[in-house]
């Protein structure tokens, strides 16, 4: 059993690179204690690195090696040596050396040496790191995963049993060695796969040889049938020639008779086409035609010309009125714009005045606050220390005051900018209101910039909105008339434009004709939809009949397959009898004869297998090949008896001559030779008896062959009928499907055209209705202004104003919220600064108190002078700041005087604007009356023009209808003339002659095609017979012999595959049993450890549970049991429970899987444990130690910082324990101590 003896560490983490530290491990317990950061975990990392070669977690970049910057060197070498005893009792040493070099911009880490050697006779084995890594687990008798995850588990990974499911699965799979057993199983499967692939290849070869054998038989049959077919086709070609000559003579006679009637037929064809076109027009216009008298009167009338002249005259008058109205509108627009400009100036002046008042008030408040701040002065008549403290406080207050004043000054500047922006914004709003007549809408959108900047700009506009609210009533009364007139003019212009657009679209469109056409198209659409449904029903019926026919064909195929299988089974029985007599069952029942032995059997019976006429049963329903000459005797039971007799006699002669078994070449003793002769002679007698009994079986075969022949006839008849039916059905379905598809496509196109026409007609009708509605609106708007419409417009402006006001209110609330939040943040920052200042003051006082005893009187005086000079500088800066503030106040007073002058100018401008507005209001009423008269006159003239236009349109429609009616009557007369001319000509006799000629032509073409097919068939058959004969001579010389050899090889490979399958199943079952038994063993140990360790009553015990997610694939999880209920421990356990569970699971796994290496290292096992659980854990470990006390190789390594835990474990443990500490240079040291409290002294105190 393997064990570890000593460990030497140098240049690893905190251990010095100059001197080595040695640690000796005891049995059964080695205790290592030390404070945090002294290098306890480094011991576990070194053991793990020495045994597995893997570095600890998070050690990239050379963190595992002593830092070169700390050592003051460019390169540092770390070395770990381990003295241990392997599983064979040999003393071994493993040494690993690693180097870390500090370059200019990076660090380089590389392994210098990894060596393992034995101390016996100086023998050593050294090699690369990978060789040592693979060899160390073999010396310890466990796998590398057990060393990493159980024996020397790192502290950061100590709770892996309760970690991520993926990590738990990987580690437990490595511990159970699932991959190793899986590789063995995969190797067997790979062998089985290769064997199966060989079987498939041989089966393909066998299938190819079988087809070659069948090909040979088929070629012989085709040669015979080809010769007979050629003779039959020659007779049929001669009959076709005679019939073709007779048809040509009759066609010549018909052509002579048809040549005299060719002109009359052409004339009749032209008349029929003309008749069809005329009838289409007559049928389409029959319902809309006018009586002949009415149409004649309409065509000769002159009222249309007079109406057109009146329409042109009225249209010119309307255009002149419209030009006069446009001139008045332009003059009125210029007046409204000038009035709006005056209103804008007045509003701007009033708003600016209000802003100046507000700014003046805010400045007065700011000045008062500044004066109150500047008056804060105190006399400084205290001692130097008191003066210093007060000046510091006063300076802080002055800084805050200066900061507030700067903010106030910035705010005032911003207010000036805001007033300028507000005035420009008001001017823009007034300009927009003045442009209502041309635009017809008001743009009330507001753009915002940044979050707080935009909101503060909105608050400035809020003052503007308050001013607007006071003057909104007067402003609206002045703008109501202009706004309502502009709005109505804009709407009327839109309606007129829409009217002109609709009139253009409806020009030449007859509404009544469109409606009638729409009804006809809908009727056609419904008719075509019904026709499409009928076609779909017909197609579904055809599909049902096709399904019934396919079912009947399937039934016939099943009957044919049944009879074929019955005949094939008889041939199979005859084959099996031959193979049993040849000794092939020895290959199947035992493994003594291999594939090579089977080949030798074939070679020894080469004369038997080389026969071309050798057969293993009938596989084709070809009765001619079964009853033709010698083949009947060869395929009968009598020929089987002859073959068996011949084989038995040859085997008997070979065996007596060579005294060996002719099948497996085994030497025969005298007793075996006598028994061999007896069996072969008995076989010869059975073969002779079989010749007589074969005649009876042949009679049975004749009966079955008769049934097969009858069934073949029935099948041939049915196939012929089925082929004819299929040909007719395919032809019929092709024609019907083509016609049906064409009809459906045509109907779909017609339906789309009709639907498009319907949509277009409905759109035109909607346009006409919209035109009537617009006319009504225009007439209603021209009768007078509506008070309700004006009121709605005012309400719209008020609604826009309210929305704007609500939006400003929301922005103001948002600003208030942000300001409050900013104030809270500022208060928190000030509090933190005060706290920091207080802490700094406390620390300064403490430093002063600690150093006061050592400071001389001169130092104190120097400090006082320095403080006084600092105080003077602060007072000087304060005086300069006060002068600057007083100058700022003087500037504010100057600005206030300028604002007073500006207010006086604004008042003068207000008085002038009021006088101008009173003079212009008197002229406005006169212009409105004149404008209304011009507008009513224009509307009246346009209505008259519209009425005359509608009258002319109706007259044009009646005239076009009269023209179409005259065409109708003329074409009706022409139709009667064509019908009379067609009735005088007799076409029945000519049609009969043409039909007869067409049938003769078809018959002639069919006979010619049949003749060509027969000649081509004869030629192809002759070529085929020739090629068949050449193929028989060239490719089928040894076909049957090769088939028999391949058949034996396939059987031998199949037996090998069966043996591999049994081996795979046995190994698979063994893997599952091993996994189950080991897991039960681990859980039993884990239950015992938990019940004796854990002191809580919330968990009865824990166990590792597996869930199979596939074949040999397991998912693991740790569950705890409470009252018979299992719960997943991950996510439901405390940190202490995780630590106890992880330690106990490692103990249980080590007990089951590390029997060859009874070493276990526990790093800080008391982490997160309370006192009771620490004591119970110590008790459990003591029990484990006492249980393995007789085992000299059991070693438990415990690393902890808990002195009480060390005392609990040392009660029955070793006499010594190790304590880790730091030297004055910061390097870790290992010192051995006695459990009785004395430190071991001597030359080897540091190991």
From Swiss-Prot:
Output the Gene Ontology cellular-component terms. Answer: condensed nuclear chromosome; Mre11 complex
Q: Which keywords belong to this entry?
A: ATP-binding, Chromosome, Coiled coil, DNA damage, DNA repair, Hydrolase, Magnesium, Meiosis, Metal-binding, Nucleotide-binding, Nucleus, Zinc
Family matches, as PANTHER family: DNA REPAIR PROTEIN RAD50, RAD50
Species name:
Encephalitozoon cuniculi (strain GB-M1)
Provide the protein name: DNA repair protein RAD50
Reactions accelerated catalytically:
ATP + H2O = ADP + phosphate + H(+)
Keyword NADP among record annotations: no
Protein family according to the UniProt entry: Belongs to the SMC family. RAD50 subfamily.
Q: What does this protein do?
A: Component of the MRN complex, which plays a central role in double-strand break (DSB) repair, DNA recombination, maintenance of telomere integrity and meiosis. The MRN complex is involved in the repair of DNA double-strand breaks (DSBs) via homologous recombination (HR), an error-free mechanism which primarily occurs during S and G2 phases. The complex (1) mediates the end resection of damaged DNA, which generates proper single-stranded DNA, a key initial steps in HR, and is (2) required for the recruitment of other repair factors and efficient activation of ATM and ATR upon DNA damage.
Subunit details: Component of the MRN complex composed of two heterodimers RAD50 and MRE11 associated with a single NBS1.
Q: Which Pfam families match?
A: AAA_23 (PF13476)
Ranges for domain Zinc-hook come to 617-716
GO BP of this protein: chromosome organization involved in meiotic cell cycle; double-strand break repair; telomere maintenance via recombination; telomere maintenance via telomerase
Gene name in the database record: RAD50
Cofactor-binding details, from the entry = Binds 1 zinc ion per homodimer.
Domain of life of the native organism = Eukaryota
- Which cofactor is essential here? Zn(2+)
GO molecular function terms listed in the Swiss-Prot or TrEMBL record = ATP binding; ATP hydrolysis activity; double-stranded telomeric DNA binding; G-quadruplex DNA binding; metal ion binding; single-stranded telomeric DNA binding
Binding-site list for ATP? 13, 36-37, 39-42, 63, 65, 67, 155
Instruction: From the UniProt record, list the coiled-coil ranges.
Output: 299-415, 459-545, 787-942, 972-1020
Cell compartment(s), UniProt: Nucleus; Chromosome
Q: What is known of its domains?
A: The zinc-hook, which separates the large intramolecular coiled coil regions, contains 2 Cys residues that coordinate one molecule of zinc with the help of the 2 Cys residues of the zinc-hook of another RAD50 molecule, thereby forming a V-shaped homodimer. The two heads of the homodimer, which constitute the ATP-binding domain, interact with the MRE11 homodimer.
Residues engaged in binding Zn(2+): 661, 664
Q: Where does Mg(2+) bind?
A: 41, 155
Q: What is its EC number?
A: 3.6.-.-
